Amino acid sequence: MRSARWFVALGCAALLHGQGAVPCSCGANPPGPPRTRESRPYAQAPADLRPFANFTEPYYENYTKTVEYNGAAREAPMVKPEEVTEVRIGFLGPVEDHPDQKLGRMMLHGAELAIEEANQSGGYGGKPFRLMIHNDQAVWGASSNEIVKMAYDEKVWAMFGSISGDSTHIALRVSLKAEVPIVNSAATDPTIPETIIPWYLTTLQDDRVQSYTLARRIYSDLGLRKIALLRVNDRYGRFGVLKFKDASRRLGHPVLIEQKYMPGSTDFRRQLEIIGDSGADGVVIWGDSGPAGNILKQMRAAGMKQPVFGSFRVVGDDLLATAGEAADGLEAVYPFDPTRDDPMWAAFRQRFEKRYNVQPEVFASLAYDTMTILLQAICRGGLNRGHIRDALAGVETFKGVTGEMVFDPNSKNVVPLYLAKVHNGKYEFRRYPMQAPYARVGENGVQYHGPAVDNAGAGPIPIALFGPRAEEIAARLAPQAPGYRVVPVPSEVPWGQASTKLVKVIWDDHALAMIATDRNSSHLAEQLAVKAFVPMIALSEDRALTSTNIPWILRLPKETDPAEALRRVLDAAARSGPNRAALREQLIGGNP
């Protein structure tokens, strides 16, 4: 397939927001420049993880506004469908003779399927899209030659790729010179969009988001302190761990030790012995799923019991097959939830498996969505690179087969990641934002210096649930809390009546914690929390709740499911025991 050109005939349609075929507009009403937007903080980074946040605004605060394009590409004549025989899109990816060729071929299949389905719906005014495939050899000179061929010789209307961060950087420079849009679904280098080149869109959350999410889970949520890094010795591993090391240092727990392995390695005993001797209480793997499976297997065989975490490329069926029971407990970040009940996702999986006899994984799925976004932009913008660029830059949200995407003004998908956890040989997924998981105890970090708090008594331990529809919610949550009793206190009744019942649950029944499900309930319950020394999780956006120097109030976003708040209470209680003060320390990420 060396430098092959694959042509897929038939016709095309944009899939409007990824939800169904509609006729391609063929640039009938090309969009103008996108509206000016501003989104702070950059990449949604929490304050305690942003560099120099205590001293000055980080340099990347300059990236919070829409990147302007003031060139002349929009002035080029619009090419009509009857003037072309095909609409070319360039593809750059490692599809042969490359360590990442398995990933590159899956990425190609996802992009290819999107084009085939678009062509089956009529093409661009009856003319088919054609994918011009070029192999990314991850050698700067060779890759740059392929990119130049696409932009100038083949005259593609847009480019797609690559996985390699260095090749993508080169492609971006060519796109600036040639004024050709480029979309990406696989490169995680956060510096790529920071070039302020206005021709780029990416759908995969970058290393910054992945690192901050892992750091939040490891340090703030689980309370681990001494982390060892085990990474692949290539650009993906080398660049990937930089942001995690930065986040670890900012949270007060610099990485204890960093070990490397060469691509293709299968024996990790030397690195694991060094990590074991270091006293690390957790391990982060930054690499691919195949080696990660061997690492887990060899760790457990050596008697190492530390929890293990990973970057998104750690997740894969081959890890489960290789590691077996040793994989249980692994947690890794992931862009979406492939186990969710979503008809759109299920239909895509069926179509993909029928076409390629294999289930789509992350590279194929994101490539399909990314190519769909590009096809929509071409249909809206027409055959004019400047207008295609405007259409891409104007994308703010998108619903695809992988779920919802939200793009910042820099055309990066910044939707929160998922945590994939292995349990009984299967992956379980849940959304996990990189913001402080329990907000903060006081916006400036309030401490508790009061008297010692007694343990809860014997029997099922009460947890108060206060807010609208409390009885209905408590009934739903009860099966999730064995050994505990979720006590509902409805807020729809008169406040005096609600307060009386809440006092009884807190003082007489000795509830271990409270969950207040809305703003009003949170404000009513906060005085009880401080007087009774009981931790309370408030589901509210009202910062005043955590700005009153009350060390018992913790805050989660108002849209948080009460089940998630309960889960966090139970997870913390499993480490703290039935003691309110110890529970509070665990909830805010204190020492285990």
Residue ranges: model-predicted function:
Residues 10-12, 20-592:
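Extracytosolic ligand-binding ectodomains
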Residues 1-8:
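Bacterial N-terminal signal peptides that target proteins for export
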